[in-house]
Regions:
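Short amphipathic alpha-helical interaction segments
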Residues: 201-215
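Residues in the recognition helix of alpha-helical DNA-binding motifs
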Residues: 87, 209-213, 228-230
């Protein structure tokens, strides 16, 4: 949930999500409709589909127990290197090296104040040397909190990163339209394309294209003239 979503928005949703799906078994058996209904408001809805797929794989391949190895975790749907390493560090207290936005900010602030276009490959050896091998979980917790403080006090040092990208405005974006269309489909057992267009009052061509995308990605299904959650 914390991938590209602020902590303040995640906390409430996390509590509801865990209450509804307390284990991998309940999550794997849940309908996509129920999962997406709780997920609404977090954005990046592909993560919700990935979580359901992950739960299914953990049940079928790993006897319901999440693997602790980052090398195995990275093979699960929607899990990249940084997320796999973060799970290994935070859930299993393993001394793995990874970079997230606050970790990056700390090391750029202290070691690259006079540089621009700093690559993560330059940061990784420094992080590896500094990492607390005995208690990596607490070390990363502290580092991430410290990164938040640095941003408040000194601005965003991550602008010096080679990988820095300013996030495009959400208002009026395709991301926003996808969320609105998906929310509309969630609100009724079945809904027609015409109803969606009338309700959202957006450009019909863009809505039709968005419906096709969501259908191709496994979010919704089309039966005759109506759409519903897959």
């Amino acid at each position: 949930m914390l991938q590209q979503t602020q902590v303040e928005r995640v906390i409430e949703k996390y509590q509801r999500f865990i209450s509804a799906f307390p284990d991998f078994s309940s999550l794997s058996q849940a309908s996509l409709h129920d999962i997406l209904s709780i997920w609404q408001g977090l954005g990046y809805n592909r993560r919700a589909i990935a979580l359901k797929q992950i739960a299914h794989e953990v049940i079928t391949k790993y006897d319901g127990i999440l693997p602790f190895s980052a090398d195995i975790l990275i093979q699960l749907p929607g899990i990249g290197k940084a997320t796999a390493s973060a799970i290994a560090a935070f859930a299993f207290n393993q001394p793995v090296v990874f970079i997230e936005t606050n970790v990056r900010r700390v090391f750029i602030h202290f070691f690259f104040q006079d540089r621009d276009n700093v690559k993560d490959s330059e940061l990784l050896p420094l992080i590896e040397r500094a990492l607390d091998q005995d208690n990596p979980r607490q070390w990363y917790y502290a580092l991430m909190d410290y990164g938040v403080m640095l941003k408040k006090e000194f601005g965003n040092a991550n602008r010096k990163s080679f990988h820095y990208q300013r996030q495009a405005p959400f208002q009026g974006s395709q991301r926003q339209l996808r969320g609105l269309v998906l929310k509309t489909v969630l609100q009724a057992p079945k809904v027609t394309e015409t109803t969606i267009i009338k309700k959202l009052k957006k450009e019909p061509k863009k809505i039709k294209e968005t419906l096709k995308q969501l259908q191709m990605e496994g979010f919704i299904r089309k039966e005759r003239n109506t759409y519903s959650i897959a």
